[in-house]
């Protein structure tokens, strides 16, 4: 597995923060780093396989990656990221207690993926741009300024994450997308789902299309197919069983949709013919 080292990304040995844009981020094999990072998805879509679990990411997704986490990107489509790198929560010169603002693992569950709405994403971009402008400065005031901006970024993300902000339809849509990640195999009634998240069906269709480029059902089908592809690669379950586990009631229909989406059959993926296992 590829290991990325801080010496290749941080501007100096004492820099606590670095900005690494990926515009766009292509498919990238599994790796980990000797530093931490906050991945901010600007726009586009892709699959983020994080510690073996696939997540669909779109504009507004924020992922917190620790130095022992492993992850990869695949099936990217105009995926643009900004990575905010930091050495460790306790490696800042002027800040202490940052760990309290970061996601916490509880009973083996780590809430790595958050979502923010478009207006918050704009504020995030401004903070990141200010940090990036100061990267070449190594004096104490500049270091303190960058660390203060990093603290502001964490506060903004925490206050604006789905757990704490459901005031507008964009935030409720983000919560719906997070819900689909956990309920993709369920039979989905879009009228009922829209009601559940206090959205009109028209608003749901319009905003989901704006954010992902897909209609709700197309987005759900792609999510199911992504989950199925992951299981084909990493489990011994039969194609039929995987189809049912991912929300498809007809394995033949599943195979047709799968080939249309990936240009490979489920059997091809299982046997590694797409090159993933080579």
Curated annotation (Swiss-Prot):
Q: Where is the HTH araC/xylS-type domain?
A: 174-272
Any GO molecular function:
sequence-specific DNA binding
Q: What result is annotated for mutating residue 246 to A? A: 66% of wild-type activity
Q: Which CDD domains match?
A: cupin_RhaR_RhaS-like_N
Q: What is the effect of changing residue 250 to A?
A: 8.3% of wild-type activity
What subcellular locations does the record give? Cytoplasm
Domain of life according to the entry: Bacteria
Name this protein carries in UniProt: HTH-type transcriptional activator RhaS
Q: Which gene encodes it?
A: rhaS
